[in-house]
Amino acid sequence: MRRALATLTMVFALALPAHAERPRPLGWAMDAMRAGSWDNAALIARRDGAVAVDVIEWHRLRAGRGTYAEVTDFLSRRPDWPGEAYLRRQSEEAVIREGDKAILDFFTGQGPQTPEGVLAHAAALLRADRLGEAQARLVLAWRTLPMSGNDQAKFIDAHGPLLKPHHAARLDEMLWQREHAEARQMFDLVSDADKALAEARIALQNLDGDVNALIDALPASKAGDPGLQADRFEWRIRKGYGDSAKDLMLSQSVSAAALGQPAAWANRRRALARTLATGTLGKWNIDVSRHARECLAPTDYM
């Protein structure tokens, strides 16, 4: 948000002549906006020109106050302004109210970001006889998107059979994202083994409870889970067990599959590689580097 505001401020500053000797009307408009007086803010901003008007409009749309027509008009008029993804997310309710054509148009190229948007988009796709696209959107959202218990129930009520094979994958992804409430919402939908694994991972992430007992109680099929190993590694780092953390990371650095989500390890791997650059643990550094090309994207090579 701060980066978007800073960029927008620069855009505005470059678009208008400087008058340092007196306050700009945009400043007064921003004050009115912060007070909740959106209409007054827009009127005041007109005194500062078209860019100032759109600065206020940008804020208003990002607050979820725009109609479908206002949102699409702004996006076509200011396609290069920052924060578009958030503006689009905040506008999904207005898009849904507009009906199927608007939904299909708006989400072409940039899919929905909210559970409600995903469900509405899928429904519109189904009514347009685009079954494959609808199912792909639903499964992707189910496997990746955090959502409330109410939204989760809506997904299951509407598309339960389609989503059932992906319950364990959703639980796993919520744990990678450290979305503990969303993970716990899945407990009744997965196996006892998956639930036990999730409880161990949550305890590790929270530095909570007897993690060794939880890990020891896991069935053999879950003991080598990549997400569990990532959480064990992070737990050791945070607890100050650096040497054993390095050993664990080395044991997982044999393939991308063993890491589970290589990007989740990347920062720690780079940090440890920098530490090892002194040569005090040169063999370990060489071993990790040997596996890096298999495990990380090119930008993550150590």
What does each of the following model-derived ranges do?
Residues A13-P17:
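Hydrophobic membrane-targeting alpha-helices
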